[in-house]
Structure formats: C-alpha cells, structure tokens
A protein has these predicted regions:
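Hydrophobic packing and interface segments
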Residues: 1-278, 283-284
C-alpha cells in the first residue's frame, strides 16, 4: 500500500511536468521526466519489498514463516488490481458515453466530470494496481528463492537472494542515473540499454557471489539463463508488436480489406508468440 501511495503521488506530480517538457523541449526531455517519475515507483516497489522481507526475516528467523508476507502482498495486489480496474473502466465508459450523446462536448473534454474520474482511475489502476502487482511478484520471487534455498543450502541459501536482490537495486539505480545523463535519440534503445547495464552488473555479481556462498557456479549459471530468457521474451514481444518488423506490416496490409482480416491476421500473429512466452520459461527451468 505504501508503494502504491508513493507511486500515485509521484504520478500526479510528474504528469503535468512531462507534458510541459514535451511542449517546450521535445521528446527527449519529456522522456527523462517520465522515466524519473516511473523510477520512483519502481524503486519504491523493490525497496519496500526487500525491506519488508528483511525485517520479517530478522524478527522471526524462519524463512517458512515469510510466506505469510507473500500472502499479504497478494491480497493487496488483488484488491488494488481488481478494484482499480473496475473503477477505471466504469469511469472510462461513462466518459465515452457522455462524449457520444452530449452535443458540443467531445471525448476527453475537461468539462465532463467523468473525464476527471477517468484520469484518476488511470492512476489508481495503472500505477497503484500495477505497482501492487509487481510488488507481489517481486516479493514472491524472493521468498520462494529463500525457502527453496533454505531447504537445500541452509542459511547460505537464504542470504544469497537477499544480497543479490540488493545488488540488483543498486545496479538499477546506476543504470537509471546513466539514462538520465545521456541524450536519448531513440527512446526504445535507451530504455533497453538500462536493462543491459543492470543485467550485466547482476551477472558479474552472481559470478562473484555464487562461489562465496555455495562453492560453485551453479547458481550463477541459473541466473544467466534467467536473464537471457527474460531478454529473449522482451525481444520476441518487440518483433511481434513493432512497426519495424514484418508481422506488424503484414497486419497493417491485411487491415486494408476490413476489420475481419485485421482480427484474423492479429490472432495468427499473436498465437506463436504466446506459445514461445509459455515454453521459454519452462525450458529455462528444465
């Protein structure tokens, strides 16, 4: 809940600034403002998640008890995601209906009160809801690693995920700082560069920490596979959604003959990438 509150406060503070930067200075400056605001939410989610796990572990000292922490995070994610989604969609539909039936009031006109509710719903659902969802996933991943590590390696298996997650946060902070310092010609390539930088730092740290904690490089190899699969999934998503590649161009050509061919082409392109998104994590585990 604290991460969601911080995210909504930062979102409302950075929205207008991002718009002003886009009008006055262009895309590059607006991207920096948007990235800085989004980074606050990301670091709040990871920071609160890791802090909560560390505090609970220091108090109880038993990794199996930590699963209750994950259940609490899942409950908040459920209410924030579902409740925020229902509110957002209700306000969105209401605003669209007013724009259709009221003469002289176009869609997203600020004179329509439902438009304000729609914007509030976007913050609740897309910021607080998604932040709670990511918080639950992040905490669950750390806790499951700690429980499995404790059952196999004892205290070393508990400390390793905590230390590596802390290094990951520091690597992300460094990558975000480098992003804000450079001039962005292509937003997508600049964002991908932050992923590559933070991933490389985590890889180096894993090869240093794995022998110290376990006496071998097996954990580091698993981390390498996980990072590579994550990057591969992102690249495959880009191939099927970017206008640079043939799939999107083919869907655009099919759309010229009507909505039916657009839907058919979209489904035929989406099914293969769904298969790869399902099988790649499974192959990674195997």
């Amino acid at each position: 809940m604290a991460a969601g509150y911080v995210g909504m406060r930062i979102s409302t503070a950075s929205n207008a600034r991002c718009t002003n930067e886009a009008m006055e200075s262009g895309l590059s400056s607006a991207l920096k403002v948007a990235f800085a605001g989004g980074s606050v939410m990301g670091f709040a989610v990871t920071g609160f998640g890791l802090l909560g796990v560390g505090i609970v572990y220091l108090i109880f000292g038993d990794p199996t008890i930590l699963m209750g922490y994950s259940f609490g995070a899942s409950s908040v994610a459920l209410f924030a995601r579902v409740g925020g989604g229902i509110y957002t969609k209700a306000a969105d539909v209401g605003a669209d209906l007013v724009g259709k039936v009221e003469k002289g009031i176009p869609e997203d006109d600020p004179r329509n009160p439902a438009v304000i509710a729609d914007n509030v719903g976007d913050n609740v659902g897309d910021v607080a809801g998604m932040g709670a969802d990511l918080f639950e996933s992040y905490a669950g991943a750390i806790l499951s690693s700690m429980v499995l590590g404790f059952s196999l390696f004892g205290d070393a298996g508990v400390r390793f995920p905590l230390v590596l997650s802390s290094i990951g946060i520091l690597a992300s902070i460094l990558a975000a700082f480098l992003f804000l310092r450079q001039k962005q010609k292509s937003p997508q390539s600049a964002l991908m560069m932050t992923i590559y930088i933070s991933g490389a730092i985590v890889l180096i740290a894993s090869f240093i920490l794995s022998p110290l904690f376990f006496g071998n490089l097996k954990a580091a190899i698993c981390i390498v596979v996980g990072i590579l699969v994550g990057i591969a999934i992102g690249f495959l998503s880009e191939v099927f959604t970017s206008e640079k590649y043939s799939q999107v161009k083919r869907i655009a050509e099919e759309s010229q003959t009507g909505a039916a061919t657009n839907i058919i082409a979209g489904l035929s392109s989406g099914m293969p990438v769904s298969y790869t998104h399902l099988t790649l994590p499974t192959k990674r585990i195997v």
